[in-house]
């Protein structure tokens, strides 16, 4: 009887508990969360998922507002709050400190920092309550139960079963596993009905060509991860395209997720959930399918670095379904944690001033196993053998890798930066990497030692004979020297004048070698070096003590000896404010020297590339001056002069920072292999026009191309190629500038330059002109006359075509 009396009481208790549990499903108005303490998250009914504050990488000073798998030890994040940045199609993860608060009040959800400033809200009102569902979806609902906002509708990098991505939504990979910023890859359900995987430039967010697409333009509808674990793309006609094809594991036994990972692969994962599954499976996430199957082979982009960073290569482990980025030997990562930034050589780049013998002594080609950079070729030879292939790369300062294909006897040369690198087991070729030789090579030491022993006895004998006879010979030498000096001084200048084709247009002064040797103090103070020789500072013994710059022409090709004075005559006929003036010359036997006016402010290279930015107005003045100087050389001289080696080192600045072009008119005097290539290339790495690498005629447009590079350097106050920059996408200025221009983010190029930001319209105009100059097709580039007009603002500048293809032409 007594138990019957307790039955009504038991029923009441059960009813109370049921209603109490039901009430916990709803998160009511007035509820709040804080990063620290026990009240830091709202849990789903089964406790599978949680919404709230999660410490970033175990760091108790920084917290994400996120949704995560609550029963998994590492608290795998599946959603995190973001806010829009000022960059196109970019968002920034919300990270807050202790003292912040998330509160559901006044019909809205709001996150405020310790100072009370709102840092995030989902931008909905009239919220009646919230729910953390067992599907992993966090919802805000109205008092009528209608969904106002849900985390499934604002995905991050992951989707879960029952989640649907409609047209116009996207998944963004993280930059790193512990860096929740937008990464280098996107999965877009485009408005046009196409499902596309993109490689995205960082930080400009410029979209490169897709590396995978469903090809369903006009037919696609939505991406579905259904409740059974299948992922498919539905079409408007009701049919489906399977995105993953893995066998579906029980939803009751396993947690499921699909994530666009940091390496650009969209993977479906499972994790043992039930006791039975945990007894059979290791408690960790296991990838059961992936798209694309092998991203190392899939991404082959004309612009950008590929799956990994520049100068690195991608490897794929099919058994673990993982990728890895590695550096070739003698290269190292810019940042060991952020390997996407690529690799750089751990040795000094080869100088283009080395002759063939020096290059062969200092560098060698070493084989590397099955690694290929398929889109970095700039030269091809066939038929050829491997030995010659090696030699041609070693003596070419542009060449970093050679690939020899034995079946076809073909050699391909590649240059930095290397892109789209991957480990290719099917590659039927020998890949050779150029590296410095070891300076203490045993073979070199032993050969040198044996040679010394062999020649030692002959050296002693020869020295004895020489010194024994020197007393007698010295008397004769003194007499001959005095007499010869007298004759030489009286006839030297007459000899030089007799060699001239015509005296008209020559510089006003003809110097003897002795005069210039004395003026330069024995060629003591070096001002600079270039392809044509070394420049020394000197001072004339005139009333004013005029400072001069003396260039000693070196490595003059034999057939050009007679052309020297003709070229001096041509240069002597040039008179322009923006050209360095030739004061005189010396032509004594093999000694060829040019005497120029001295430029007190040195080269543009020194002026531009230092810790402080030169004033914007001075940079504009230099750009306009250089353009006028080139226009004069190309179109106003009696005989057109193509410079062929335009670079900041060949632009000098006078007392008033007026830009003056130097080294013009010397191009055809130099040996065609001066840059150590067999293609007749002249110029300097980073400034060379694409046509130098092709068997086509060279025109004045090669100077226009080089000017485009210089113009970007003037705008940004940095070199075209900088291997030490923090972001890999900024390594090559011409690529980065093109990305920024296409995205409408020119301000990124001059972010730390207040003067340039104030003149952002002119900056944009200069960048547009530069991109016109950088067109791969020479006929597409403007003349220097047109360039002058565009820089001055005298004509409208149409939008330049995207010069993406010039990746194959830059060094």
Swiss-Prot record:
GO terms for biological process: defense response; response to other organism. Residues 24-464 are extracellular. It is found in: Membrane. SMART domains: B_lectin, S_TKc. GO terms for molecular function: ATP binding; carbohydrate binding; protein kinase activity; protein serine kinase activity; protein serine/threonine kinase activity. One of its GO terms (cellular component) is membrane. Disulfide bonds join 296-314, 308-325, 327-343, 389-411, 393-399. Keywords: ATP-binding, Disulfide bond, EGF-like domain, Glycoprotein, Kinase, Lectin, Membrane, Nucleotide-binding, Plant defense, Receptor, Serine/threonine-protein kinase, Signal, Transferase, Transmembrane, Transmembrane helix. It is a single-pass type I membrane protein. This is G-type lectin S-receptor-like serine/threonine-protein kinase LECRK2. It comes from Oryza sativa subsp. japonica.
């Amino acid at each position: 009887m007594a138990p019957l009396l307790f039955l009504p009481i038991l029923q009441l208790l059960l009813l109370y508990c049921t209603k109490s549990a039901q009430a916990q499903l709803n998160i009511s108005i007035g509820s709040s969360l804080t990063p620290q303490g026990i009240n830091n998250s709202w849990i789903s009914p089964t406790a599978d998922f949680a919404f709230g504050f999660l410490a970033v990488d175990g760091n108790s000073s920084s917290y994400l507002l996120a949704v995560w798998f609550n029963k998994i030890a590492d608290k795998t994040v599946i959603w995190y709050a973001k806010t829009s940045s000022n960059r196109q199609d970019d968002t920034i993860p919300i990270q807050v400190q202790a003292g912040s608060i998330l509160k559901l009040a006044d019909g809205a959800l709001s996150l405020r920092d310790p100072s009370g400033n709102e840092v995030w809200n989902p931008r909905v009102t009239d919220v009646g309550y919230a729910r953390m569902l067992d599907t992993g979806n966090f919802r805000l609902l109205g008092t009528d139960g209608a969904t106002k906002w849900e985390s499934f509708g604002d995905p991050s990098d992951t989707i879960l079963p029952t989640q649907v991505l409609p047209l116009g939504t996207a998944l963004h990979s993280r930059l790193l596993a512990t860096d929740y910023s937008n990464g280098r890859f996107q999965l877009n359900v485009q408005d046009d009905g196409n499902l596309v995987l993109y490689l995205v430039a960082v930080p400009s967010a410029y979209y490169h060509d897709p590396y995978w697409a469903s090809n369903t333009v006009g037919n696609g509808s939505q991406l579905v991860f259904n409740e059974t674990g299948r992922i498919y793309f539905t079409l408007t006609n009701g049919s489906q395209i399977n995105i993953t094809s893995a066998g579906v594991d029980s939803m009751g036994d396993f947690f499921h997720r699909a994530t666009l990972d940091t390496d650009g692969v969209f993977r479906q994962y499972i994790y043992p959930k039930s006791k039975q599954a945990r007894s059979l499976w290791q408690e960790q996430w296991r990838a059961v399918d992936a798209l694309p199957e092998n991203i190392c082979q899939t991404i082959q982009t004309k612009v950008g670095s590929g799956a990994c960073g520049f100068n690195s290569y991608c490897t794929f482990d099919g058994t673990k379904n993982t990728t890895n980025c590695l550096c070739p030997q003698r290269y190292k990562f810019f940042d060991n944690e952020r390997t996407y930034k690529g690799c750089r050589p751990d040795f000094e780049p080869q100088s283009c001033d080395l002759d063939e013998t020096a290059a062969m002594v200092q560098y060698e080609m070493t084989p590397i196993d099955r690694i290929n950079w398929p889109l970095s070729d700039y030269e091809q030879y066939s038929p050829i053998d491997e030995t010659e292939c090696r030699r041609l790369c070693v003596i070419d300062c542009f060449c970093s890798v050679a690939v020899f294909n034995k079946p076809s006897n073909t050699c391909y040369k590649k240059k930095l930066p290397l892109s789209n690198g991957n480990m290719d087991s099917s590659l039927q070729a020998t890949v050779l990497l150029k590296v410095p030789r070891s300076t203490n090579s045993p073979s070199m030491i032993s050969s040198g030692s044996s040679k010394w022993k062999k020649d030692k006895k002959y050296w002693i004998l020869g020295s004895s004979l020489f010194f024994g006879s020197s007393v007698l010979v010295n008397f004769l030498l003194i007499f001959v020297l005095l007499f010869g000096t007298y004759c030489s001084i009286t006839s030297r200048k007459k000899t030089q004048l007799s060699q001239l084709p015509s005296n008209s247009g020559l510089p006003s002064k003809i110097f003897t070698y002795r005069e210039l040797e004395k003026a330069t103090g024995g060629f003591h103070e070096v001002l600079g070096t270039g392809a044509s020789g070394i420049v020394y500072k000197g001072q004339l013994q005139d009333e004013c003590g005029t400072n001069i710059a003396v260039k000693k022409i070196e490595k003059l090709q034999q057939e050009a000896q007679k052309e020297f004075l003709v070229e001096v005559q041509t240069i002597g006929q040039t008179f322009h404010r923006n050209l360095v003036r030739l004061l005189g010359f010396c032509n004594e036997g093999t000694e060829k020297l040019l005497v120029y006016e001295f430029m007190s402010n040195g080269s543009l290279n020194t002026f531009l590339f230092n810790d402080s930015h030169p004033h914007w107005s001075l940079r504009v003045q230099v750009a306009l001056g250089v353009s006028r100087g080139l226009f004069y050389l190309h179109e106003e001289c009696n005989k057109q002069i193509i410079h062929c080696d335009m670079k900041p080192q060949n632009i000098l600045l006078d007392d008033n920072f007026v830009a003056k072009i130097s080294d013009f008119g010397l191009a055809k005097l130099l040996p065609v292999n001066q840059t150590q290539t067999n293609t007749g290339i002249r110029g300097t790495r980073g400034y060379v026009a694409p046509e130098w690498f092709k068997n086509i005629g060279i025109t004045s447009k090669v100077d226009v191309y080089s000017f485009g590079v210089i113009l970007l350097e003037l705008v940004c106050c940095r070199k075209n190629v900088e291997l030490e920059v923090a972001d890999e996408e900024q390594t090559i200025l011409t690529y980065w500038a093109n990305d920024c221009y296409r995205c409408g983010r020119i301000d990124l190029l001059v972010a730390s330059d207040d003067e340039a930001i104030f003149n952002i319209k002119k900056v944009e105009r200069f960048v547009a002109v530069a991109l016109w100059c950088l067109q791969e097709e020479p006929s597409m580039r403007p003349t220097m006359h047109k360039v002058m007009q565009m820089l001055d603002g005298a004509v409208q500048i149409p939008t330049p075509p995207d010069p993406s293809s010039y990746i194959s032409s830059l060094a």
